[in-house]
């Protein structure tokens, strides 16, 4: 892992506090550290644990942390510092709260000697409006990171009604460069579209798929079942590709009706399964910390205990998807989950819910024919009989979507090998930070 210059950069990393953003951003940070950079990561106190694995792998000389208090906000309950603890509509309040980190960060940087200032800020695109201002004040390069694909970017940025995301788009396009968690051979036409139509420059680096840097680490919270027990359960499954993994990411909570339909489908299908059920979200009201719970039907877990495993809270998703027993994945089609499923070589069953899930579905299901759609949106309730049939058939190795996905997997793994497109882009990114 070499760069084109002998100087190694000092990079200030500012991730967005939601696991779908934080985790790939830290995976990217690991790759930058491997290339000789010194990194300082800015987080708030309750997000500091995300950095434990990086701390264990890199020396304090090269990996540093800057912990600033989470700015209070009237619409965010006390003690909440991550979006996954809130419903998605709270994102505007999270943006507002995090923008108040501008002044404390400026104060911190102002007290540093010039030799200790970073060469670049690698910040979340979601925070780019105020990160760019900080970078400009200290003549530092601001490079934006988006953990999504170029197709989604090209669709979102082409929409006329972008509401409050318009400021994010503008700030991202005005930053020094853009890094995305995709690989060039997956979507070359869309990478070129973003580069030529939306950016004021050609500095876009596809660096994916960004893979976990340490197996078995806690990458998202607490689990009701230890990863070792999950692994042992999978090891006990006699047939390869016989288990369906069901998970909808860090933000999605199913309604009671959706949960009942899914439970019925799993039971009717007779397939082996692991179902990750999310923690409840806090309401967006600082005076009301009550929660809305998912409702697993009474008696379900007892009836399926010989074939199924229900995990409440965080699940070791990467480990599950890469296990030989797992053959398919019922997913919301969040981009990180798509890449993890692709690398794991499992059949993707798409139930898009919100935001970029629909753009990902267009790319993966409609354009690339590498997944099967089983749900329509956040409000849809699947027919349990139909879903049961799809689940039962999803382990078939001759499904055309599985064959296509495996070809994409080969391209993904080539991209991150030494000499591959994403590998070289990471080298170039680190070199560019020093120029």
Swiss-Prot record:
Record organism: Arabidopsis thaliana (Mouse-ear cress)
Q: What does the record give as EC number?
A: 2.4.1.-
Residue positions annotated to bind UDP-beta-L-rhamnose are 18, 250, 315, 332, 336-337, 340
Q: Where does quercetin bind?
A: 21
Per its record, how is this protein called by name?
A: Flavonol 7-O-rhamnosyltransferase
Substitution effect: residue 88 to A/G/S: Reduces catalytic activity 1.6-fold
Biological process GO terms, please? flavonol biosynthetic process
Q: Which family does it belong to?
A: Belongs to the UDP-glycosyltransferase family.
Residues that coordinate or bind UDP:
18, 250, 315, 332, 336-337, 340
Effect of changing residue 354 to A: reported as: Reduces catalytic activity 2.2-fold
**What keywords does the record list, in alphabetical order?**
Glycosyltransferase, Transferase
Function, in words: Flavonol 7-O-rhamnosyltransferase that catalyzes the transfer of rhamnose from UDP-rhamnose to the 7-OH position of 3-O-glycosylated flavonols, such as kaempferol 3-O-rhamnoside, kaempferol 3-O-glucoside, quercetin 3-O-glucoside, quercetin 3-O-galactoside, quercetin 3-O-rhamnoside and isorhamnetin 3-O-glucoside. Is able to glycosylate the flavonols quercetin and kaempferol to yield quercetin 7-O-rhamnoside and kaempferol 7-O-rhamnoside. Shows a strict specificity for UDP-rhamnose as sugar donor. Does not act on 3-O-glycosylated anthocyanins.
Q: In which pathway does it act?
A: Flavonoid metabolism
Q: InterPro entries from the xrefs?
A: UDP_glucos_trans (IPR002213)
Swapping residue 357 to A/Q leads to an effect described as: No effect on catalytic activity
- List the expressing tissues: Highly expressed in floral buds. Expressed in stems, leaves and flowers. Expressed at low levels in roots and siliques. Expressed on the adaxial side of cotyledons and emerging leaves, in trichomes, root columella cells, and the late elongation/early differentiation zone of roots.
């Amino acid at each position: 892992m070499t760069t084109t210059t002998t100087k190694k950069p000092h990079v200030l990393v500012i991730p967005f506090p939601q696991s779908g953003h934080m985790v790939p951003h830290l995976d990217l940070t690991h790759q930058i550290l491997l290339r000789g950079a010194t990194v300082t990561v800015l987080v708030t106190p309750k997000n500091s644990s995300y950095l434990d694995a990086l701390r264990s792998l890199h020396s304090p000389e090269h990996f540093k942390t800057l912990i600033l208090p989470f700015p209070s906000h009237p619409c965010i309950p006390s003690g909440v510092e991550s979006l996954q603890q809130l419903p998605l509509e709270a994102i505007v309040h999270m943006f507002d709260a995090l923008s108040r980190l501008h002044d404390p960060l400026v104060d911190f940087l102002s007290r540093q000697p010039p030799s200790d200032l970073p060469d670049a800020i690698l910040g979340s695109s979601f925070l780019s409006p105020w990160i760019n201002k900080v970078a400009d004040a200290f003549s530092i390069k601001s490079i934006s990171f988006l953990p999504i694909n170029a197709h989604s970017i090209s669709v979102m940025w082409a929409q006329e009604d972008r509401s409050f995301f318009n400021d994010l788009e503008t700030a991202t396009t005005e930053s020094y460069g853009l890094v995305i968690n995709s690989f060039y051979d997956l979507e070359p036409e869309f990478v070129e579209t973003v580069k030529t139509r939306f950016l004021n420059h050609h500095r876009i680096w596809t660096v994916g798929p960004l893979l976990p840097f340490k197996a078995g680490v806690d990458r998202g919270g607490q689990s009701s079942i230890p990863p070792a027990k999950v692994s042992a359960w999978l090891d006990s499954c006699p047939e390869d590709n016989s288990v369906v993994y069901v998970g909808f990411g860090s933000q999605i909570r199913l309604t009671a009706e959706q949960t009942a339909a899914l439970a019925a489908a799993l039971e009717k299908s007779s397939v082996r399964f692991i179902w990750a059920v999310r923690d409840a979200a806090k309401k967006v009201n600082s005076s009301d910390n009550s929660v809305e719970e998912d409702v697993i039907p009474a008696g379900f877990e007892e009836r399926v205990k010989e074939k199924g495993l229900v995990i409440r809270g965080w699940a070791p998703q990467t480990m599950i998807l890469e296990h030989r027993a797992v053959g398919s994945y019922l997913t919301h089609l969040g981009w990180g989950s798509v890449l993890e499923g692709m690398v794991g070589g499992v059949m993707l069953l798409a139930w898009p819910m919100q935001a970029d899930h629909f753009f990902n579905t267009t790319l993966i299901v409609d354009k690339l024919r590498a997944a099967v759609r089983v749900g329509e949106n956040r409000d849809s309730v699947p027919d349990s009989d139909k879903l049961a049939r799809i689940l039962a058939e999803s382990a078939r190795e001759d499904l055309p979507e599985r064959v296509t996905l495996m070809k994409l997997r080969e391209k993904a793994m080539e991209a991150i090998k030494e000499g591959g497109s994403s590998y070289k882009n990471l080298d170039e990114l680190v070199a560019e930070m020093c120029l």
